[in-house]
Amino acid sequence: MTGKQHQKHEQKARQAQVKAQINRDKARSKLLRQREKLARRRARNRRQSEVRRGNQSKAQHDTQSETQRGTQSKSQRDNETGGTKNPTAHSTLPPQKTNAENAVRNSHSTVPELPKYSSVPARERLYGLRLHRETTASEDKSVTVAVTRAPKAERQRGGADE
């Protein structure tokens, strides 16, 4: 390399380093903004769920104290309150349904009824409503279902009530 080429190469390398630093700084600031926004949204959600649960007085107290605090940073607020409360105590997921409700949902099996390249039919698989009907059947029917559905090895050993 000649002197001029070497200079140009070094200049491009410096420019690449500066550009990389700028991009890193932009990404960091973007992540910080996202985290702050998420923290605000979670705090709002916690307050709303507390109000829904009937803890109105606590939520009102939190709202008043938050407006009094103004624009303090999170670390300053944490130092004043003695640390953060458990952030995982508030779930953003909807409440889980009961097993019976989940069983009634539209469910389907992706397993074919007749296995490919086989002349033997596949064993019956229970999903959705059929599973719900089988599991909520009367006690005597569920015993017979358990006997007929017992694994082959268990039937050979005589482990199922026959």
Swiss-Prot record:
Protein's cellular compartments: Gas vesicle
Keyword NADP recorded: no
Segments for region (Disordered): 1-162
Compositional bias per record (Basic and acidic residues), positions renumbered to this chain: 22-37, 47-64, 122-142, 151-162
Keywords: Gas vesicle
Gene Ontology CC terms: gas vesicle
Up-regulation conditions: Transcribed from early-log phase, decreases as cells enter stationary phase, probably as a long gvpF-gvpM RNA. Highly expressed in 25% salt, poorly expressed in 15% salt, no gas vesicles are formed at 15% salt.
Major localisation: other
Extent of Polar residues compositional bias: 65-74, 81-110
Keyword ATP-binding set for record: no
Quaternary state and interactors: GvpF to GvpM interact with each other in vitro, and may form multi-subunit complex(es). Interacts with GvpC and GvpO.
Function description: Proteins GvpF to GvpM might be involved in nucleating gas vesicle formation. A minor component of the gas vesicle. Gas vesicles are hollow, gas filled proteinaceous nanostructures found in some microorganisms. They allow positioning of halobacteria at the optimal depth for growth in the poorly aerated, shallow brine pools of their habitat. Expression of a 9.5 kb mc-vac DNA fragment containing 2 divergently transcribed regions (gvpD-gvpE-gvpF-gvpG-gvpH-gvpI-gvpJ-gvpK-gvpL-gvpM and gvpA-gvpC-gvpN-gvpO) allows H.volcanii to produce gas vesicles.
More about this protein: Encoded in a 14-gene locus called mc-vac.
Family according to the record: Belongs to the gas vesicle GvpI family.
UniProt name for this protein: Gas vesicle protein I
Species of the source: Haloferax mediterranei (strain ATCC 33500 / DSM 1411 / JCM 8866 / NBRC 14739 / NCIMB 2177 / R-4)
Lineage, top ranks: Archaea, Methanobacteriati, Methanobacteriota, Stenosarchaea group, Halobacteria
